Amino acid sequence: MSKRESSKYKIDRRMGENIWGRPKSPVNRREYGPGQHGQRRKSKLSDFGVQLRAKQKLKGYYGDIREKQFRAIFAEASRRKGDTPENLIGLLESRLDAIVYRAKFVPTVFAARQFVNHGHVKVNGVRVNIGSYRCKAGDVIEVKEKSKQLVSVLESVQLAERDVPDYIEADHNKMVATFVRVPALTDVPYPVVMEPHLVVEFYSR
């Protein structure tokens, strides 16, 4: 595994879980953490430790979002009417980089952020280069014409390890996707269990 590939899986190793369901994840080959002490029996986590781990896993899944930004997303989820854990997931799945990843225009969520930042994506016909840009139901996301033949894009749409969820409609011939609706937690195809209610408990201490 190259240094670049290894860095992409540091979150998997830290969590001890294959959080993106990738075939090459190092945790597929071992059930212990990284480092020389990784094979020691894991001690039972405290309530705080469990909550912290849930937060780190959710942050990591969306490209290791910075704490300040993630806290701001949580704060908005808390202010909104309805269930805070559901609001949190809805806000995360509404991010432009998350939608580009879900639509299979790129192979990883990290690649999605870079792809957006480099100006390869339009929303409703306007170029947007901010990965955290929040999309609304009905928004149309498209890959710029000159970017459609990039090797990473052509390879990504062929990935068999994940499907496009039903809250996104994707046309891989035209490289266009529509964000149909904001999903509920149960709609999101996480390869591992995500526990946003524990994130709420963490920030509510």
From Swiss-Prot:
Q: Write the record's keywords in alphabetical order, separated by commas.
A: Ribonucleoprotein, Ribosomal protein, RNA-binding, rRNA-binding
Q: Where is the composition biased (Basic and acidic residues)?
A: 1-16
SMART domains to which the protein is assigned, alphabetical: Ribosomal_S4 (SM01390), S4 (SM00363)
Q: Which Gene3D superfamilies match?
A: Ribosomal Protein S4 Delta 41, Chain A, domain 1, RNA-binding S4 domain
Domain S4 RNA-binding spans what residues? Answer: 94-157
One GO biological-process annotation of the entry reads:
translation
Its GO CC terms are: small ribosomal subunit
Offer an example of a GO molecular function term for this protein: rRNA binding
Q: What InterPro entries does the database record attribute to this sequence?
A: Ribosomal_uS4 (IPR022801), Ribosomal_uS4_bac-type (IPR005709), Ribosomal_uS4_CS (IPR018079), Ribosomal_uS4_N (IPR001912), S4_RNA-bd (IPR002942), S4_RNA-bd_sf (IPR036986)
The segment annotated Disordered runs over 1-46
Q: Which family does it belong to?
A: Belongs to the universal ribosomal protein uS4 family.
- PANTHER family under this entry? 30S 40S RIBOSOMAL PROTEIN, SMALL RIBOSOMAL SUBUNIT PROTEIN US4M
SUBUNIT field: Part of the 30S ribosomal subunit. Contacts protein S5. The interaction surface between S4 and S5 is involved in control of translational fidelity.
NCBIfam families xref list:
PRK05327.1, rpsD_bact
Question: Any idea what job this protein has?
Answer: One of the primary rRNA binding proteins, it binds directly to 16S rRNA where it nucleates assembly of the body of the 30S subunit.
Q: What is this protein called?
A: Small ribosomal subunit protein uS4
Q: Which organism is it from?
A: Sinorhizobium fredii (strain NBRC 101917 / NGR234)
Which gene is this protein's source?
A: rpsD
